[in-house]
Amino acid sequence: MELTFRWFGPNDPAKINHIRQVGVTGIVTSLNHIKYGEKWIDYEIKKRKKIINEVKSSKELKLKWSVAESLPVHNDIKSRSGKYKYYIDQYKDSLVNLSKNQIKTICYNFMPLIDWVRTDLNYKLKNNAIALKYDHLKMCAFEVIILKIKDADKRYTKKQIIKAKEIFKKMKNSEKHSLKKSLLGGLAANDRKFSINELKYEIDKFKEINHTDLRNNLKNFLVEIFPILKEHKIKYCIHPDDPPYNIFGLPRIMSNENDIKYLTSIFKHENNGITLCTGSLSVDKKNNIERIIKKYGKYINFIHLRNIKRDTNSKNFYESDHLDGDVNMVNIIKLILKEEKRRKRNNRPFNIPMRPDHGHTIIYDQDKKIIPGYSLLGRMKGLAELKGIIKALN
């Protein structure tokens, strides 16, 4: 595996010189400062690449930009409405410009409106580390009380709504603010931030789109860009839905093995691949990640290794230590290494980029302003644990 680390650009509290010390060779980053849906021009790509590559002397480790995560797909493309044709043209140009700069692995998602979702950004564990958590009743409270979505009763039972209102009433103002911030797009990986009115407006735009419609929109999008992926040998990799539930009543179409089967049936080619995110897929206990790797290993172009612990009788979960959760990380890594050996035997590029996905906020990072889920020390700890498994298995 090629060991990589997520970096959010010059404003990230974690600096390139810090990341150089954690034991990786690759950087995973995105041009978040470019307006949502607009073209990533050559100048901006080169500018970011220069920062990543820069060293003070020949003795320093030179990092490289390994993965673009994410190249955001505009919601007009996902809904196939508005200016979707314009945004597809912008997207094509971005793909070509990244490829010309030797950035060939590109991650994306097709989640409507909101990217990955958590309701608690400061969930304290027994050891006083801080983790991210998803609480389904808090999600219900957000929809019913804050957004005032009229059809929320179609997704939640009367009992759940009553309980959600009770929970919300007991929440501190700071907790309510944190809930709003998270669910309005306040997490760093989200492509866009919304006001309450904007989010309600955007939800209404998607109201007529069902699961089949969104699948078709993904297919039509891939048909448009696949010739570029193939010509430029781009390893395109869709990220699973996180969590793998419909959010705000909007469909999600990359939540399970059946969805991966559909994706890979559109173009049975490695350029049309997946991001294996163990943390996202494992939220649904019906997802057998080991079987997914065995069946769709050749389509894995990028890896996020993260662990979670599910509540037994609800949709709640929190992000656990990388080696302590519902994901059998040893078995997962064993299967990934097996897939890499298969590629090597077939004389194909075999080093799949992997990053430790999220990390607990620990030690000195608790006294700093950090990006939720992206504590430098927490991710470094997770990376060290994962490297230990890789070393032992090799």
Q: How would you name each of these model-derived features?
A:
Residues I19-I34:
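Basic, amphipathic N-terminal segments that precede the first structured/catalytic domain
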Residues L121-L214:
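Extended, charge-rich helix/loop segments that form flexible
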Residues S30-K47:
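Glycine-rich, proline-tolerant flexible connector loops at the mouths of alpha/beta enzymes
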Residues M1-T4, G9-N11, N17-G23, D76-K104, ...:
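Histidine-acidic metal/acid-base catalytic patches
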Residues I52-V55, K59-K64:
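Asp-box/BNR beta-propeller blade signature and adjacent active/binding-site loops
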